[in-house]
Regions:
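Glycine-rich, histidine-containing beta strand-loop boundary motifs that form or position
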Residues: 48, 57-59, 87, 93-96, ...
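Bacterial Sec-dependent N-terminal signal peptides
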Residues: 1-27, 514-518, 557, 572, ...
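Extracellular, surface-exposed repeat architectures
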Residues: 59-113, 202-206, 211-223
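Extracytoplasmic redox metalloprotein regions
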Residues: 95-206
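Surface-exposed beta-strand/loop patches in extracellular or lumenal glycoproteins
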Residues: 89-122, 229-236, 456-469
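Compositionally biased Ser/Thr/Gly- and acidic/asparagine-rich
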Residues: 156, 162-165, 169-170, 177, ...
């Protein structure tokens, strides 16, 4: 056991990493960890109330699989910065609990015991003050207790619970807190208390009469949390969250300038992550975006400002809170094995930033995941733009396409929307509105798109952030009623719609099937693979003019593109050098395109 006595101060700036089997800090001693990781295999005992551990400049505490639990009535101190002003909420989850009891259990978080005002000195802080008024202030730190709430499961339903300054929140559960005046959107908080460790249990509820039940939770540790491990390394978490679309984290976004509930502008961003660590994320539908996907405004504004957004990455930072929806009455679990040392400044770990503030750097909403896609994983985004009472917003939808996706619900690759609005757009999976969809790619794939319109108006459709798409592969919006195809890679689609919900009018396709006067059937044009001769064969008994023959693999990669073909009754193309697998043949005639799936075995 490492025992730090009153006369000994350990400064981690002398070491790259501190490693301990157990760690005890005694009376009037402290450990100062600067921009490093402190790893303790078993327990941390900050024994007396004058003993402290200070984590500074993104330093973090990691703990191993020991089962003893932390003890003592001293405090660990770790900073985290809020990202909203006094009118807007951050969702938090405290990394520490109160120090009112000396045992080995994680302690509840109490605002007026655990949140401190940061001063210029790196180890000196004082407890934050509280006001019952609606507005807090930054210097000195005064927090409005009016906005301190948790959202927890009850006997049957989940609901908001007021905690105020002196209430408690069990370890692993989250809480809401508004920002302060005088700090912009960057108030710095000092969380001080007993560090959480080990297995932490949070209750979730199954839907009630079809209505999802949410729990406000978050990262409960003084270190980053690997969201992939949280989603995929624990069968109990999968069972609790893997109902239709429930395997998602929901981050609150808000852009309000009033405390009046009716004036709130906000919604939930949707996040999920697959077993390979690929993040899928869409923002809440109140902001507007330009053609490049950059945020250009929010509801109630013309799209001319340039607020930014920090997108959650794979590693959830200290203090990050979020909502989850239960698929069953069960528990979800946080464990030390999910903890990682990952600094926010290193990328792929951001405390969620609402879009109500100016950012010093241009953040694209898919910036931190675009370089994570394997070559056989395609992705694109559809944006539905709408105006309502001179207010503009965009619903962003995401489509993931990979050969291991299915047409059913794929946990970690797709996610339901937390809510829909009178004017909205979404996909449908197992009769549930989805904002993130995952399907295998086929050239003849059709993706139905449901569109809702509150009142008659022009609506727009766009696409952006296409990843691993062949340059010549179109993304069409098919208006079934008008039988029109708009290639969204070339131009936006705009259509005037009467009020209503359109469930069967729009779909996303990758080929145009507009027919001429003469419709060609299978006997007029036969396309098949002759594996005996290793040839792709096209029989054209009526001698149609064939303008082009293209072959694509299952990922959409073009294998060949034959043009300016003479009129013949039969064409053959060698496939000897191609890998075995499924391919799509696309035959383009004057007024029609015929697609056929073939399987090549050499």
């Amino acid at each position: 056991m490492t025992n730090l006595k009153p006369s000994l101060i350990v400064l981690s700036l002398f070491f790259s990493v501190e490693l301990f089997a157990q760690l005890t800090v005694r009376n009037n001693a402290y450990i100062f960890v600067d921009d490093q990781v402190l790893f303790v295999e078993d327990d941390v005992n900050i024994q007396e109330n004058t003993a402290n551990i200070y984590l500074r400049n993104e330093a973090q505490l990691l703990q191993g699989t020991g089962t003893t639990g932390n003890s003592g009535i001293g405090r660990l101190s770790v900073y985290q910065r809020g990202t909203v002003n006094n009118f807007n909420y951050n969702y938090w989850c405290s990394p520490v609990g109160n120090t009112s009891g000396n045992n080995n259990a994680n302690r509840p978080f109490t605002p007026n015991n655990n949140i401190y005002d940061v001063t210029a000195a790196p180890i000196t802080s004082s407890l934050a003050a509280y006001t019952s008024g609606y507005n807090g202030s930054s210097s000195p730190l005064v927090i409005s207790s009016a906005w301190l709430y948790s959202y927890n499961p009850g006997g049957q339903y989940s609901d908001w619970d007021y905690i105020g300054a002196g209430g408690t929140v069990a370890a692993g559960y989250g809480f809401t807190m508004k920002g302060t005046t005088g700090s912009g959107s960057n108030q710095l908080y000092d969380f001080r208390g007993k560090p959480n460790t080990g297995e932490i249990t949070v209750q979730v509820l199954a839907p009630v009469a079809g209505v999802p039940q949410s729990t406000l939770t978050g990262n409960p540790y003084p270190s980053a949390l690997d969201a992939r491990d949280f989603f995929h390394m624990d069968p109990e978490n999968q069972a609790a969250l893997a109902g239709t679309g429930a395997g998602a984290l929901y981050f609150w976004e808000q852009n309000s300038s009033s405390h009046v509930l009716a004036s709130y502008i906000g919604g939930y961003a949707t996040y999920t992550i697959d077993s390979g660590g690929i993040v899928a994320y869409i923002p809440a539908p109140w902001a507007t975006y330009d053609a490049a996907g950059n945020v250009t405004g929010g509801v109630g504004t013309s799209p001319n400002s340039t607020p930014g957004v920090d997108v959650p990455g794979r590693y959830l930072p200290v203090g990050q809170g979020f909502m989850v929806e239960g698929a069953a009455n069960a528990n979800i679990y946080f464990r030390n094995t999910y903890r990682e040392y990952w600094k926010e400044s290193s990328g792929d770990s951001h405390f969620f930033r609402s879009q109500d503030q100016n950012a010093s750097e241009d953040q694209n909403v898919n910036e931190d995941t675009s370089n994570l896609l394997p070559s056989n994983y395609m992705r694109f985004r559809i944006v539905y733009d709408i105006e309502h009472n001179s207010q503009y917003f965009s619903r962003e939808l995401l489509v993931n396409m990979a050969d291991y996706a299915t047409d059913d619900y794929d946990y970690g690759m797709e996610a339901k929307l937390s809510e829909t609005f009178p004017s909205d757009a979404y996909f449908v999976c197992e009769n549930v509105p989805f904002g993130i969809l995952a399907v295998p790619f086929y050239l003849d794939r059709k993706i139905p798109l449901v569109v809702k319109v509150h009142h008659q108006q022009n609506v727009k459709f766009r696409t952006y952030a296409l990843q691993n798409f062949p340059d010549d592969l179109p993304v069409y919006l098919h208006d079934i009623d008008n039988n029109t195809y708009t290639n969204l890679r070339i131009q936006n689609a705009e259509v005037n719609l009467a009020a209503g919900t359109y469930t069967n009018r729009f779909e996303i396709t990758f080929q145009s099937e507009t027919l001429g006067v003469e419709e060609i059937n299978d006997t007029d044009l036969m396309v098949y693979q002759n594996n005996t001769t290793s040839e792709l064969t096209i029989k054209n008994p009526n001698s149609y003019q064939i303008n082009k023959v293209s072959l694509y693999d299952i990922t959409g990669k073009q294998i060949f593109d034959e043009v300016k073909l003479p009129i013949n009754t039969e064409y053959t193309f060698s496939t000897k050098k191609l890998s075995e697998g499924t391919y799509i043949v696309k035959v383009s005639l004057e007024n029609q395109t015929v697609s056929k799936k073939v399987i090549i075995h050499n």
